[in-house]
């Protein structure tokens, strides 16, 4: 399975980090068990701290711990869109689609202009092959972030997989290689996979991994994994350093891209 891309907010209010202390010569340093500080009594601060702990637990994939902290955050300050959005992200990772969709819809009821919840709800619908509904949510997300490549890519995939070949082809024709984003290569790979041309698709994916950082690629490759076109191993295929195009060189190899016209038709 892929690592589903979800968006949520972590506001580290008043979080202070402690630096590592050097151990004395000859001493063996052993890590001390981490003791969590008591939650603040003030309701607003309690809500914030518990939310941050929930987000941190989510990032460690401690999903039950994240839900526990969210319950505390909810009790301190009920009906918060950020809490509902994070709860949806947790249930998405647990692949509990019903609860995930319910949580994201609640987040949007509480805060209709929350772009993260629009994207995340679109992702759940996309993963469940509800492409027209997913496209609608990604479109709303893009209304607030019109140049977001991941949102544009998701819109394109919705058109491609729903059989809206005219819209998909129109958007694909606007794309060119971009030194800042692998969207061109993964959109072309998706088209090739959809047409059954695995050789061409794999070449586009390999080209992306030769050019762009792994994190940038995995964001786009995830959707191809979720749809069964790629495996997790293929997402991290090693490339030789001497064959990898450096980012400085890439800027001279690829033409500048006009992104203003690179938006799928509504």
Task: Tell where the protein language model's regions lie, with residue ranges.
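Terminal, low-structured helical/coil segments at or just beyond the last alpha-helical repeat
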Residues: 24-37, 200-266
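Alpha-helical segment of the N-proximal tetratricopeptide repeat
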Residues: 43-79, 86-89, 93
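Register position in tetratricopeptide repeats
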Residues: 59-60, 93-94, 127-128, 161, ...
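Canonical tetratricopeptide repeat
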Residues: 85-86, 120, 154-155, 187
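TPR/TPR-like (Sel1-like) alpha-helical repeat modules
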Residues: 141-146, 153-163, 173-181, 193-194, ...
